[in-house]
């Protein structure tokens, strides 16, 4: 029997990332993957308003429609890149559309997907508080904010009696460790749990790409921002070193990448940290969950 690392060792929980749902993953496969994920004892799903023109949320709404809402945790994100700002009208408009797509009256976590330099953060947080009081979300999350911004946000929320963020979703893997320097100490101090996205560096750590010239159809062709983030010579050089070490120790690069996150990174089950697991098909999902 495969050892389920996420449940039986450090207990770093997996969260099913749905960025591929509605693009590389059709509705039938979305349902299968969601059901399989839950059958393995996991119950947390992560989506966003911007994922695939709303189809990720629509598919999740259909996949979860017959399941008791108390049996799963559902997160979505509002994004300033849609309207150019995160004020009350923009957040409300996006969230109402998301709730309709997701076929629910409330999400467990509402993330601010990216910082909005055009709207004072006080205004954004006041808007979140008003929406929270209406019962449309249970927890406030942050994603892609700096350590300094997190400190400021927590201070504003504390001083005004507004719901403070309880979860932070950030880029983290064996190749990208910037968050360890400033962000992690801040979120530990403020009692915020951390969810790591891109655990396989968008696929670079899957072993699928051998060089900077080896791009094939997938995330790097479908999402240009991923190519900008990872398609660099230094990443490929690092992967070659890791692959050599993995080969010498009879372990796959994917397994080593997840084992590093679970056993040797800053993630810690006592803080209820998690790893966003994104997959393009059910076989990849099972593989990523069963090393």
What is each stretch, according to the model?
Residues 228-291:
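Conserved short secondary-structure transition element at the edge of the structured enzyme core
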Residues 2-72, 133:
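N-terminal binding-site loop/beta-alpha segment at the start of enzyme catalytic domains
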Residues 11-15, 43-44, 71-77, 106-111, ...:
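Structural preference for beta-strand elements that scaffold enzyme active sites
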Residues 63-64, 93, 157-161, 184-186, ...:
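Short, hinge-like loop/turn segments at secondary-structure boundaries
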């Amino acid at each position: 029997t495969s050892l389920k690392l996420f449940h039986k060792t450090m207990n770093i929980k997996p969260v099913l990332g749905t960025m591929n749902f509605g693009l590389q993953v059709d509705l039938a496969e979305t349902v299968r993957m969601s059901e399989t994920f839950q059958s393995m004892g996991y119950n947390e799903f992560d989506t966003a308003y911007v994922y695939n023109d709303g189809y990720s949320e629509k598919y999740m709404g259909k996949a979860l429609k017959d399941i008791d809402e108390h049996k799963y945790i559902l997160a979505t994100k509002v994004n300033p890149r849609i309207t150019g700002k995160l004020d009350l009208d923009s957040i409300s408009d996006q969230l109402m559309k998301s709730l309709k797509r997701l076929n629910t009256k409330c999400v467990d976590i509402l993330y601010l997907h990216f910082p909005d330099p055009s709207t004072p953060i006080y205004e954004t947080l006041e808007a979140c508080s008003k929406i929270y009081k209406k019962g449309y979300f249970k927890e406030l999350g942050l994603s892609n904010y700096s350590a300094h911004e997190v400190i400021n946000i927590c201070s504003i929320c504390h001083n005004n009696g507004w719901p403070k963020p309880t979860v932070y979703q950030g880029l983290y893997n064996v190749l990208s460790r910037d968050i360890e320097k400033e962000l992690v100490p801040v979120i530990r101090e403020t009692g915020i749990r951390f969810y790591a996205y891109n655990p396989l560096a968008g696929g670079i750590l899957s072993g699928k790409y051998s060089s900077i010239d080896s791009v094939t159809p997938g995330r790097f062709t479908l999402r240009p921002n991923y190519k900008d983030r990872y398609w660099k010579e230094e990443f490929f050089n690092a992967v070659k070193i890791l692959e050599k070490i993995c080969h010498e120790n009879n372990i796959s690069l994917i397994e080593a990448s997840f084992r590093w996150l679970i056993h040797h990174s800053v993630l810690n089950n006592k803080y209820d940290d998690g790893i966003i697991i994104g997959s393009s098909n059910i076989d990849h999902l099972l593989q990523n969950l069963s090393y």
